[in-house]
Amino acid sequence: MMTQKPRTVICVGDIHGNISKLNKLWLNLQSDIQNSDFSSALVIFLGDYCDRGPETRKVIDFLISLPEKHPDQTHVFLAGNHDFAFAGFLGLLPRPSDGSEFKETWKEYSKSEEREGWYKGEGFENMHLQSRRWAGKIRVQFDYSAYGVLYNGSIYDAASTFESYGVPHGSSDLIKAVPESHKKFLTNMVWVHKEDDVCIETEEGLTHCKLIAVHAGLETKNNVEEQLKLLRDKDTSIPRIQPLTGRKTVWGIPQELDDKKTIVVSGHHGKLHIDGLRLIIDEGGGYTDTPLAAIVLPSKKIIRDTDNFSN
């Protein structure tokens, strides 16, 4: 009796406006993966398509084109924290389901408003905290050396996103400049994606697992189902959504998933980290001298834009 070959799953790290890296990575994936496996693959983009790099607009054009170019693939586009903030600036986030206003998200962090230079232009009254931070202008430079980042301009390094659409940083003209197809893409991004049967090579051999893909990760000490519900419901009443923005709190695998054969795959952290079933695929972090990486399952092979595959 023939066993069915496991489906190829490709998880792509944070792109951050780097269209040239994305083009090269995609070509390398096509070159390295058997054609039949590539053409039917599940491709999960782990979020953060915008900011830092110069070509956010072209990156989103590329992503939008994939379903037509590769109709037998399945494409999943996770929202990263940068994309969340971008969408909020454009007025695309769902309203808080508890009936509160977005201004309620400002209160806990109001002492940082002047220091971080939150956006105060047209429409700010109805923006989520993260969107005001995204479009603002920092009064001073912040050295987040733990993340290898020296922020200039917006705390999100968002100036390049504005400029890719032909408008200056912090301008409300961005709302009109972003095409409707891009707004639809940003609206439809999912905050979490689950698969019930994904194969991965482990010390025990080929193992069938569940998979949860979320931009930053799941809080290791909080109830998993409550977190998944928040993400499925797109709860925008929260100022900082840890599964999209967290660092140490979402680095590992939640304790309750330890013995449940569940892969948790993320980007966000500016590192490539593979520890059992915890996969963090963000080797590049959006910076010029670092690669854009993807992981291919079940083999766990890492493919980068910098790889040179001979034909």
UniProtKB/Swiss-Prot annotation:
GO cellular component: cytosol
Names of required cofactors: a divalent metal cation
The entry's keywords: Cytoplasm, Hydrolase, Metal-binding, Protein phosphatase
Signal peptide (UniProt feature, chain positions): none
Alphabetized Pfam families for the sequence: Metallophos
Catalytic activity: O-phospho-L-tyrosyl-[protein] + H2O = L-tyrosyl-[protein] + phosphate
Record-annotated active site: 82 (proton donor)
Enzyme class: hydrolase
A single MF term (Gene Ontology): protein tyrosine phosphatase activity
Localization annotation: Cytoplasm, Cytosol
Cofactor: how bound: Binds 2 divalent metal cations per subunit.
Cross-referenced CDD domains: MPP_Rhilphs
Cystine pairs: none
SUPFAM superfamilies tied to this protein: Metallo-dependent phosphatases
Function in brief: Protein phosphatase that dephosphorylates specifically tyrosine-phosphorylated peptides; especially active on dual-phosphorylated substrates containing a phosphothreonine-X-phosphotyrosine motif.
Family: Belongs to the PPP phosphatase family.
Identification of the protein by name: Tyrosine-protein phosphatase At3g09960
Source taxonomy: Eukaryota, Viridiplantae, Streptophyta, Embryophyta, Tracheophyta
